[in-house]
Amino acid sequence: MAAVQTETLVDRAAAVLSARRLADADTPAMLMVSGGSDSTALAYIACELRERGALGQLAMLHVNHRLRGEDADEDARFVAQLAELLDVPLFSCEIDIAGEAQRTGENVEAVARRERYLAANEALESLCLHAATPLADGRILTAHTADDRVESFYMRSIVGTGPGGFRAMKYRNGPVVRPLLDASREELRAYIAERERDGAPVACDDAGCLWREDATNAHTDRFRAYVRHEIVPRAKERNPQLLEVLGRTMNLIADEDDMLEDMVDGLMAGHVEALGDEYDAGCVLAPAFGAEPLPLRRRAVMRALQLMLGRDARVETASVEAVLAAFDDEAGGKPRSGYVANIQGDLAVSANKRGVRIEPMSAYR
């Protein structure tokens, strides 16, 4: 395992927070800690960042998904020990993820992710209340690494995504901040091991391990584990600097994606109107929408559908294309009067000379 200078790793996390204006000394931060090596390192690093004035009040959240029996209970005990060691308040909860997935018919991993972030937002609200800080100023810190980002890049390459999807992970997404996105998993494990060698306080489980291992992460029938253990190692054989190279590539994509998203903000402000106060009721695309550049129109439609379907929904390419087809490119982008289509989410797309409406089919009828 490669050695790493503690200060170097903490310096890099501090630089991410500062350069990207993600947090400061007044920022309450909820740390999502599973007990694995990445999130355990995040807990130690966040405490050092707090001491430097790069973060404000801290708290931890641990969610027991009740999927791994006694192993999950041992994870919870380890995180409780870690929180006590660092003198950081701990929020913990148990959620029957398997039962919820069976009830809703959703994928277990998708349900786990959704419930985890719901719990994180609730815990952050409590932390901000205690810190007398507006909720909008609070942050949820996750331990996603350069490895996670590269894995997401390959996963999206396999299943398909829009250009913006190849940025893989953002340093910030709403209240969620990822300060370790430039660090590798190997570096974080070396950091913890070095902490122990230096005599700094560290948590250990009953077997003397410095972090918890989730055995299911090795099960290659799971998509991310397959990419992690089968694809990324082969790619590293070709290029040992894969994490750094793809990291730079994804940052370039992210810069251009941010610029395009800013342009879409302007397009939507001028040519897209929500029906009512929320997009739940639908929206209208003005006639002039069809004359805008296709890449911007496509992104705007994608965003409008995401707002209507919910953040966890996967917007289908066919749905986006069905909305775009309501405008006649050969006629300068004018709406095709009489055009009607039914797309995912039982949404109706209809066009007339006043524009293109996207609304629930029940409202259209």
Show the residue positions of the predicted features.
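Core alpha/beta nucleotide-donor-binding catalytic domains of modification enzymes
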Residues: 2-229
